[in-house]
Amino acid sequence: MKLLAMVALLVTICSLEGALVRRQAAETDVQTLFSQYLQSLTDYGKDLMEKAQPSEIQNQAKAYFQNAQERLTPFVQRTGTNLMDFLSRLMSPEEKPAPAAK
């Protein structure tokens, strides 16, 4: 009976030790995987910076701002004209309409 209890205890301890070793091995794999991920992300960033030349980015930004200016200039002018008309009507003393007859 003691022999059976010792064998069961030995099997339990060995399985727990094996689980602990597997857990520790999994942690190092996660660390390795994370470091490889960061390295690939860094390499991708470097490649992207090499491909996208600063002059290209500046040209794209200039084109965007020119396009925005072309679209917004008429709108701003029209809004300014409407605002001035509104203010001039508000400030000019016009005759009030006669009250409606009862």
From Swiss-Prot:
| Annotated keywords | Cleavage on pair of basic residues, HDL, Lipid transport, Oxidation, Secreted, Signal, Transport
Name where it mostly resides.
secreted
Report the superkingdom from the record: Eukaryota
| Compartmental location | Secreted
Any one Gene Ontology MF annotation carried by this entry is: phospholipid binding
- Identify its protein family: Belongs to the apolipoprotein A2 family.
Q: How does it assemble?
A: Monomer. Interacts with NAXE and NDRG1.
Cite the PANTHER family for this sequence.
APOLIPOPROTEIN A-II (PTHR11027:SF0)
Q: What is this protein called?
A: Apolipoprotein A-II
Origin organism of this chain? Rattus norvegicus (Rat)
Q: What gene name is given for the protein in this entry?
A: Apoa2
